[in-house]
Amino acid sequence: MLSESLTKTKLIDPLILTLLQNIRGHRSNLENLKSIKIDPKLSNIISDKEGKELYIENEFHKAKGFRKLHIEVAEFSRRLKILHCVFFPDPHYDIPIFGMDLVKVNEVVSAAIVDLSPSSKNQNLKYDNLLSTIDKSVFESEREIPGWGDIFSQNVFFASLKNESEKSAFCKIVDHYLLVLIKLSKSSILDHDQEIIQERIDFQKNYCRQQMKNEKTSLVLLKYFDKKWVDEYIKKVLFDF
């Protein structure tokens, strides 16, 4: 297993690259954007072991209103490709949690999900109307939210993508959600109310706890790493708080 510092993804999947470019573009519009350093053994990993080829690249940043902007690109055994992104807000600001995941097995997109998840009570009332008007009629295979998914908003979008038009439509939805997020972040002001700050901390902790209930994440990683490494990766890289 080899850890490297990588500056751009080695994946050439067109859909992942389109989404990645879009997310990075919106991220660049945030104020005071700075990179975050993390243990190299957890950030960028490459293995060329036959049958267990592995590539994981992580990007970590912070910005005004956001404590952590995380993007993960991964490929397992040259079959399974993943794009994972979570923008965690700074609890001192009234900003939702942006989350997006794309899972592709060979050429089939089995899961595509995006949401602006509330980070405090009734926060979603501020932006629900900005998301609810999106036309999703093109999608034929919307998926059911898992039991632990009560952390998501009522406008969470989750589907399998069957064709190029659905892939294109999903990219547009992600772009729209990011536009709303950036708009909310630019209008948000620093809060000093300790009660609401604590509420936002508690919401983020619950978001991370619920995400950790998704056993598919650990099951994939356990095929390539031992349990100790997987637990550390999930708790320190994916869903830390």
From Swiss-Prot:
Keyword Oxidoreductase found: yes
UniProt record, GO biological process: phytochromobilin biosynthetic process
Domain of life (superkingdom): Bacteria
InterPro entries: Ferredoxin-dep_bilin_Rdtase, Ferredoxin_bilin_OxRdtase
Gene3D superfamilies (UniProt xref): 3.40.1500.20
Example of a GO MF term: cobalt ion binding
Catalysed reactions listed for this entry: (2R,3Z)-phycocyanobilin + 4 oxidized [2Fe-2S]-[ferredoxin] = biliverdin IXalpha + 4 reduced [2Fe-2S]-[ferredoxin] + 4 H(+)
EC number: 1.3.7.5
Keyword annotations: Oxidoreductase
Homology family: Belongs to the HY2 family.
Function according to Swiss-Prot or TrEMBL: Catalyzes the four-electron reduction of biliverdin IX-alpha (2-electron reduction at both the A and D rings); the reaction proceeds via an isolatable 2-electron intermediate, 181,182-dihydrobiliverdin.
Stored NCBIfam families: PRK02816.1
Protein name, per record: Phycocyanobilin:ferredoxin oxidoreductase
